[in-house]
Curated annotation (Swiss-Prot):
UniProt name for this protein: 7-cyano-7-deazaguanine synthase
Keyword tags: ATP-binding, Ligase, Metal-binding, Nucleotide-binding, Queuosine biosynthesis, Zinc
Record-linked Gene3D superfamilies: HUPs
Gene assigned in the entry: queC
Organism: Chlorobium limicola (strain DSM 245 / NBRC 103803 / 6330)
Cofactors required: Zn(2+)
Amino acid sequence: MKAVLLISGGMDSLVTTAIAAEEKLELAAMHVNYGQRTWQKELECFRRICNHYQIRHRLEIEAGYLAQTGGSSLTDPAMPVSGADLQGTDIPTSYVPFRNAGFLSMAVSWSEVIGAGKIFIGAVEEDSSGYPDCRQVFYDAFNRVIELGTRPDTAIEIVTPLISMQKCDIVLKGMELNAPFACSWSCYKSEGRACGVCDSCARRLRAFELTGVRDPIEYEVRPKYI
């Protein structure tokens, strides 16, 4: 069976790729540039991940409309990226309105064309308090949308292997599968060295701290988050 992987270049999409690779599927990879601050580094990591797993069927898509519509510190340089708030429940400034729905729509379109039966995405429910499109209920609903909005003979399923995992468990799973964490990027702000203080860096650093393993990427600072 063919499967499409949505690969941002981040830690979660890396481990999702490692899991999919274990299933011996025919893999195709999609990356979306939506005008995010770190798009060059993310694209570099996407390509490195694909090279590592020998994924040759790739699609790199421009989705600049998400930057044009605005509303997120990831795409609007005038909006500051929020610092780490690991206990907060408010939606952070890094939320890109309805982003994952757009990504999934593009992935479904491509899957129909190439005959893929699965779409893998590295969504994590742990983040759902800040990101409403990272919840299992969202993906359950989108599977129904696919069923209603594609040809009758189309059978495409969204797969979320990390959805119920904690970040530290994702690190452990990646280590178990020998995922190349050095090929991934999570920072919202920087493309040289990861900042270490944005929400995404904090979640990643805390996950590695909890496992007792040092994150292999370079940081400007490495605060303690546990």
